[in-house]
């Protein structure tokens, strides 16, 4: 019942003329409570809500102990405005703008004709979480060590290859990569909206090996994270009408936040992952535990159960780890009937037609 009530609150629009943050307290047992908080995405991001949660726990603990409430360490709205205007007038902003102007993806990605939403899906409600096989997590660690890349680069590579298989294009793939714009110390105490999304554009010619693709992806991620503060959406909305609505997003979310309320331990977790333009895959956990959740209404992925997508990604990861020297063209990422569907969407038959003089 608590989840249903929280979901109802979550699906009730917050008017921009009213409060953009809301809280509710549910008592489920004599000694068990749930605190539910949500904020309009223009006002606070996930890290901002974590700051608020820690502050609530601090105030509660002080009241229970009969102690003075510690002063807040939050920055103010003025601090946020000054931080953003200062960045906009800086050389860093100009460098970041130049970089992203040269690294926007072309008007490609998933086929434009497949942007329609799957019936019964919305862009916010996440799926259930499915745990990846610990043996597969071991393969991720192994490949990460052998190639000297970060672990999340392996998961991102598998996601990119799956998205590429459905795109009808064999030479390039573009993903949305959510990032935090909190790159300076002052921004890390602001309970505000400082999240962003940057495009991750990857060359994936068929002859490239798995290892080369993974290393290139890791290098590309390191490069773009040097420019993660820039609001890339301001360029994508105004340069050539580029749209991101048909790109798959891949996001990595930290494990649950542990809080203490007057000696009582509490665990905080996200009930959704924010707005999703097309479709998103969310990897959660730490160590040997890795969970996958999805959200979004974009096809074809919204028609798959999360367990199916997890199984597909696991097969890709196992194949990648087994032979990093194999070419990308040797990876069979689709089922037999799915190849025919992609051929139809991408108009592959046109390649066999005689050229028009």
Predicted regions and their residues:
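Short amphipathic alpha-helices and their capping loops
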Residues: 1, 5, 17-19, 54, ...
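AMP-binding/adenylate-forming domain of the ANL superfamily
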Residues: 2-4, 49-50, 79, 93-98, ...
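Active-site-proximal acidic secondary-structure segment that organizes catalysis
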Residues: 24-78, 163, 302-322
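Acyl-thioester-dependent condensation/acyltransferase catalytic cores
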Residues: 1-37, 44, 102, 106-109, ...
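Flexible, non-catalytic linker and terminal segments flanking ANL/adenylate-forming cores
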Residues: 222-224, 253-262, 300-357
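Extended, hydrophobic beta-loop-alpha segments that form or line the acyl/peptidyl-thioester binding
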Residues: 50-56, 152, 171-178, 205-212, ...
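His-Asp-centered acyl/peptidyl-transfer active-site segments
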Residues: 31-32, 85-97, 143-156, 166-269, ...
């Amino acid at each position: 019942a608590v989840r249903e009530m929280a979901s109802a609150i979550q699906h009730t629009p917050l008017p921009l003329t009213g409060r953009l943050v809301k809280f509710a307290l549910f008592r489920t047992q004599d000694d068990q409570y749930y605190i539910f908080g949500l904020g309009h995405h223009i006002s606070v991001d996930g890290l901002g809500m974590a700051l608020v949660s820690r502050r609530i726990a601090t105030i509660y603990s002080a009241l229970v102990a009969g102690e003075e409430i510690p002063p807040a360490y939050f920055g103010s709205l003025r601090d946020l405005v000054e931080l953003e205007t200062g960045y906009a007038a800086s050389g860093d902003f100009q460098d970041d703008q130049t970089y992203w102007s040269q690294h926007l993806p072309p008007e490609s990605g998933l086929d434009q004709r497949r942007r329609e939403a799957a019936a019964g899906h919305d862009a916010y409600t996440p799926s259930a979480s499915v745990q990846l096989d610990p043996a597969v997590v071991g393969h991720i660690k192994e490949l990460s060590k052998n190639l000297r890349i970060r672990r999340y680069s392996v998961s991102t590579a598998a996601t990119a290859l799956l998205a590429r298989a459905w795109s009808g294009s064999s030479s390039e793939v573009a993903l949305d990569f959510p990032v935090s714009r909190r790159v300076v110390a002052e921004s890390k105490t602001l309970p505000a909206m400082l999240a962003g999304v940057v495009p991750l554009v990857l060359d994936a010619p068929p002859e490239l090996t798995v290892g080369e693709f993974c290393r290139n992806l890791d290098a590309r991620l390191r490069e773009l994270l040097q420019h993660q503060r820039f609001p890339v959406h301001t360029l994508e909305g105004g340069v050539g009408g580029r749209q991101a609505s048909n790109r798959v997003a891949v996001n990595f979310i930290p494990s649950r936040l542990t809080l203490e309320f007057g000696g009582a331990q509490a665990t905080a977790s996200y009930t959704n992952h924010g707005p999703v333009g097309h479709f998103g895959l969310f990897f959660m956990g730490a160590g040997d535990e890795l969970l996958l959740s999805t959200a979004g209404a974009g096809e074809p992925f919204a028609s798959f159960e999360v367990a199916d997508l997890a199984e597909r990604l696991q097969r890709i990861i196992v194949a990648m780890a087994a032979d990093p020297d194999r070419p990308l063209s040797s990876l069979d990422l689709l089922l037999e009937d799915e190849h025919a569907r992609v051929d139809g969407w991408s108009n592959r038959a046109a390649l066999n037609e005689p050229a028009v003089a």
